[in-house]
Curated annotation (Swiss-Prot):
Keywords (A to Z) from UniProt: DNA damage, DNA repair, DNA replication, DNA-binding, DNA-directed DNA polymerase, Exonuclease, Hydrolase, Nuclease, Nucleotidyltransferase, Transferase
E.C. code: 2.7.7.7
Family: Belongs to the DNA polymerase type-A family.
Gene transcribed to yield this protein: polA
InterPro entries, alphabetized: 3'-5'_exonuclease_dom, 5-3_exonucl_a-hlix_arch_N, 5-3_exonuclease, 5-3_exonuclease_C_sf, DNA-dir_DNA_pol_A_CS, DNA-dir_DNA_pol_A_palm_dom, DNA/RNA_pol_sf, DNA_polI_H3TH
Lineage of the species this protein comes from: Bacteria, Pseudomonadati, Spirochaetota, Spirochaetia, Spirochaetales
Record protein name field: DNA polymerase I
GO molecular function, one term: 3'-5' exonuclease activity
Annotated ranges, domain 5'-3' exonuclease: 174-261
Organism, as annotated: Treponema pallidum (strain Nichols)
Top EC group: transferase
Catalytic activity: DNA(n) + a 2'-deoxyribonucleoside 5'-triphosphate = DNA(n+1) + diphosphate
Keyword Hydrolase: yes
Length: 997
């Protein structure tokens, strides 16, 4: 399939203006005394574009030299802008001259702005089924964004940001097609466009969410509140007049051919002469290097490049880089090391991009890094010296496996300056033996005992250890990094690196400060869903990174990767991680989330790593016996189901189950899916009221799941010491709660007999006890604190049974007359409010009518009016800001809070309430975990935190320490944060987890 063509349209004047003012305080003056700030800045930015995005079709679009139709229509258009500097104007002809010399098409049309010409060209090429990338920081061009048109903006930190429909929705909270009407309502003070007086972006967006268009708003003015209606009605003329000014013309009568805009090959020789003439020698050198790099990479279609081609492209990149390294190195030592290193066998980080769907990859560039391997211990020491002096170092380790508990270290990479990174292998290559096939030939040690010793002492891969002294030297430098209290070590998925380094004996207690970019990205957008480095690099920097699958063949490990490929891959990881650090830290600061990150999430990371390493002891014989007893029960349920159906069938087959339930037994079918009528859990629960077979099927399914998920698999997951090591996922939920996987120990049922039996298998080792500390109704306590409802606060202060009290209120009886069934209903409602339960869900939960469920909710809010007021306040505040905030300041964006769909909006409001409560509770538990760990370290104690199951913490301690551990738990957990009412915990100790509660 032929690749779709992509036309790049540059708003030239916007970039010129930005470039000129970037040097306003220190203008660049050439030998002739002329100001060349705009020329230099413009072509530096253009160089980045050309090198990163490799455009084939490119047009630089300029504004009209004469007044435009907008000035004729509205003489005050842009009248408030400062007069453009004569020095800036003088540079525009020179910029056009150089563009033409390069072979880049330059377009302008009298009477029209560049944006109109861009809109016209975008429309024309879209009709030819081409893609368009608009390079502009003008918000007006965002109204052109669609499936085939994207906008590339240069941010204040000089990073290119891809603006697609998702970006527009996030930034302006409307669709691109609604931007014209949004801007018409808002107006634009910089262009002197009036808009509607008193209408800002939030109000304008809200109106468009409700009524769709500007015309729709004016058709429904009767439904607006009086004050808003007055503004809208009075501003009608200005609104539509503003729209006529802001709307981009797509009918500019210009002559244009896509093929005429082809800029390949660039005539750098002609352009370089002009650069030299104007005293811009560095630009001449950069453009020559850029073309050489393009020519070199064009011959290298795959990642497996020959050594000679790698070194050629590396030298080209270095020639460009070395002229500027003086001004970018953080210290003289860094400068010295980098200059000497980059003059040798540097490796270019450029990787070819396959022809893929342009809607996804049109903005993706190659990482322009300068990467090299380091195998000399003396050289490594110098680099680590510079890294430590820098204060911030990105780190990434490479291993021969993906599981942190049984993998070996192959090498590591570091970066302490953007686009420059180093890879240090533990498998030492003999570079002189590399061939054109890039197969790595390593000198292997013949001393088996030495290899075994290195593996046991350092956890490093011994498959190709050349010299134990080298390994010792590398490990010494690793210890320097991880044990430097003044150093910030930046990692992506740092818990994995922490495990590997700890197992390798690099540290006992990590002293450096950890910054995990994966956790930072999650904290900024906890609903994003995916936080892989490759995805973030593409999203934030429009860089396509080398993927693991590209360098590691199926069935092999990183230890088999050829040296040059290993350098490129590993060093790029460190480089991207370093870039992510600066980008994400700034965003954390801007969003007010840096405190949550630094005081909660990062101190928690080593605690979680330690919990995973320790694990919890499992009695294999107990779970094996449970597997047998569960199998007997499952067989009995199966027999009962067959008896009720009248014949045998495959209970696991939805199709056969549909036939039995709805055709043979004539039970009422529920919701329909693509496979017929649903037989899911909710449907079977309803059918259980009508026929016993549904209840038996539910029991059969539940027990089968417990057997396969837990009793059969747990014994296999236990290590040689009998301990099971779950993984705690720090970024697994949008509310900040921790999740558990492989195995998921948080989902073992606590109420069922079978679930309790499974927990019984988790036991303390000889001479130790398990200790459980569980927060008492923490989410209701948080709700009482946040809502300040008097009835709730008084109940907790007086230690009244909150569920009995709620039952007394909603059933209008005294608390002494509350029956167990009443309390059960009240408990469901209490927690249902916290979890955002609708009347429909409550009716299903309590097996009552929806009308009755709704009446219970009404009576609940009558009982606790403060809760109702609080829930309304949360919804309104979330509607204003777009996000909800926890007690500690954690954020979650509720993107459907302004939905025009009533059900969706109500769901979003419940989600906002639930998030604020659940996130705050999660904050409290995390703060308590950190405080407890610090208290243990101060003693010091041998007690260890093993598990976190939402509001419950499980510890293992020597029996002699049980009493003091309980004291610490009460002190730290009940005072983790100060609320209006005290936090309470329930503490138990025993031999097994199943003994508790």
């Amino acid at each position: 399939m032929q690749e779709k063509k992509t036309l790049y349209l540059l708003d030239a004047y916007g970039l010129i203006y930005r470039s000129y003012h970037a040097f306003a305080r220190a203008p660049l003056i050439n030998d002739s005394g002329a100001n060349v700030s705009a020329v230099y800045g413009f072509f530096r930015s253009l160089h980045t574009l050309l090198c990163h995005y490799r455009p084939r079709y490119f047009v630089a679009v300029f504004d009209s030299l004469t007044p435009t139709f907008r000035h004729v229509q509205y003489p005050a258009y842009k009248a408030k802008r400062d007069k453009t500097s004569a020095e800036l104007y003088a540079q525009i002809p020179l910029i056009e001259e150089i563009l033409c010399a390069l072979g880049i098409t330059v377009l302008r049309h009298d009477g029209f702005e560049a944006d109109d010409l861009i809109a016209t060209l975008a429309k024309r090429v879209a009709a030819e089924h081409c893609h368009v990338v608009i390079i502009s920081s003008d918000k007006d061009v965002l109204q052109l964004v669609c499936d085939t048109v994207q906008v590339l903006r240069l941010d204040i930190d000089h990073k290119w940001t891809c603006c697609d429909a998702a970006y527009v929705q996030q930034r302006w909270t409307v669709m691109p097609t609604q931007l014209l009407d949004l801007f018409s309502l808002m107006g634009d003070s910089s262009d002197n466009v009036p808009g509607v007086r008193g209408i800002g972006p939030k109000t304008a967006a809200h109106l468009l969410h409700c009524f769709g268009t500007l015309d729709g708003i004016y058709r429904h003015t009767y439904s607006l509140k009086e004050a808003l209606r007055t503004k809208i009605v009075c501003g009608k003329k200005d609104a539509f007049f503003s729209r006529s000014l802001i709307e981009l013309r797509d009918d500019v009568p210009c002559v244009f051919s896509l093929e005429d805009s082809c800029c390949i090959p660039l005539d750098v020789t002609s352009a370089a002469r002009i650069f030299v003439r104007e005293g811009l020698h560095a630009l001449a050198q950069q453009y020559r290097a850029c073309v050489q790099e393009i020519d070199t990479e064009a011959t290298n279609d795959t990642l497996q490049m020959t050594e000679s081609s790698v070194l050629t492209s590396g030298r080209c990149a270095n020639e460009c880089f070395l002229s500027q390294v003086e001004g970018r190195a953080s210290t003289p030592e860094v400068n010295s090391v980098l200059k000497s290193e980059l003059k040798t066998s540097a490796v270019s980080g450029a990787i070819p991009i396959e022809n893929r769907d342009l809607r996804q990859d049109v903005m993706l560039a190659r990482s322009a890094g300068h990467y090299r391997g380091v195998t000399d211990p003396v050289e490594l020491k110098r680099i680590i010296d510079c890294a430590c002096a820098n204060g911030v170092v990105a780190f990434d380790c490479e291993t021969d496996g993906l599981h942190p508990h049984d993998t070996r270290l192959v090498g590591f990479s570091i970066c302490f300056q953007e686009a420059e990174a180093f890879y240090v292998p533990l498998i030492v290559p003999d570079v002189s033996l590399h061939t054109e096939s890039t197969q790595c030939t390593c000198a292997r040690s013949t001393n088996v005992e030495t290899e075994k010793e290195c593996t046991e002492q350092h956890g490093v891969s011994a498959s190709a250890v050349q010299d134990p002294a080298y390994v010792q030297a590398v490990m010494h430098q690793l210890r320097r990094l991880w044990n430097d209290e003044t150093l910030t070590l930046v990692m992506h998925n740092g818990k994995f690196d922490y495990h590997v380094m700890h197992r390798a004996g690099v540290f006992e207690h990590c002293a450096c400060n950890i910054f995990d970019t994966m956790v930072a990205a999650w904290l900024l957008d906890p609903d994003r869903g995916t936080y892989g480095m490759d995805v973030l690099a593409a999203s934030f920097f429009q860089i396509r990174t080398i993927t693991f699958e590209e360098v590691v063949a199926k069935g092999q490990t990183f230890a088999h990767v050829p040296y040059e490929c290993a350098v490129r891959y590993a060093a790029e990881d460190a480089d991207i991680t370093f870039r992510l650090y600066h980008y994400l830290k700034l965003r954390l600061e801007t969003a007010g989330l840096l405190s949550v990150f630094e005081t909660i999430e990062m101190p928690l990371l080593p605690i979680l790593a330690r919990m995973e390493e320790v694990g919890i002891f499992l009695r294999k014989d107990v779970v094996q016996q449970l597997t047998r007893s569960f199998s007997d029960l499952i067989q009995q349920y199966e027999h009962d189901i067959f008896s009720l159906a009248g014949h045998e069938f495959n209970i696991g087959s939805p199709k056969q189950l549909q036939t039995v339930l709805f055709q043979e037994l004539h039970l009422p079918p529920g919701k329909k899916n693509t496979q017929g009528y649903s037989t899911d859990h909710s449907v079977l629960k309803k059918l259980a009221r009508k026929h016993p077979i549904a209840e038996k099927i539910l029991l059969f399914r539940d027990l089968s799941k417990l057997r396969s998920t837990y009793t059969e698999s747990l014994a296999k997951l236990a290590d040689q010491t009998g301990r099971v090591h779950t993984s705690f996922v720090q970024i697994g939920t949008a509310t900040g709660r921790l999740s558990s996987r492989n195995p998921n120990l948080q989902n073992i049922p606590i109420k069922s007999t079978e679930g309790r039996k499974i927990r019984q298998a988790f036991q303390a080792t000889v001479g130790h006890e398990l200790i459980s500390a569980d927060y008492t109704q923490i989410e209701l306590v948080v709700l009482a604190h946040l809502s300040q409802d008097r009835n709730l606060l008084n109940a907790f202060r007086q230690h009244i049974d909150i569920h009995a009290l709620t039952a007394a209120y909603i059933f209008n009886v005294s608390i002494d007359d509350v029956q167990p069934a009443m309390r059960r209903i009240a408990k469901t409602i209490n927690f249902g409010i916290v979890y955002g339960m609708s009347a429909f869900r409550l009716s299903d939960e309590l097996k009552i009518s929806q009308k009755e469920a709704q009446s219970f909710i009404y009576r609940y809010f009558e009982t606790y009016p403060g809760v109702y007021a609080f829930s309304t306040q949360v919804a309104e505040q979330t509607r204003k800001t777009g996000y909800v905030t926890s007690l500690a300041g954690r954020r979650r964006y509720i993107r459907t809070i302004d939905s025009r769909n009533t059900l969706e909006r109500a769901r979003a409001e419940r989600m906002a309430l639930n998030t604020q409560i659940q996130s705050s509770a999660a904050d409290i538990v995390k703060i308590a975990m950190i405080a407890i760990q610090r208290a243990f370290a101060r003693r010091p104690l041998r007690a260890q935190l093993l598990l976190q199951v939402h509001d419950e913490l499980i510890f293992e301690a020597p029996a002699a320490e049980t009493a003091i551990v309980k004291e610490i738990l009460f002190a730290e957990m009940e005072h983790a944060v100060e609320l209006s009412i005290p936090l309470r915990i329930h503490v138990e100790s025993g031999n097994s987890w199943g003994d508790f509660h």
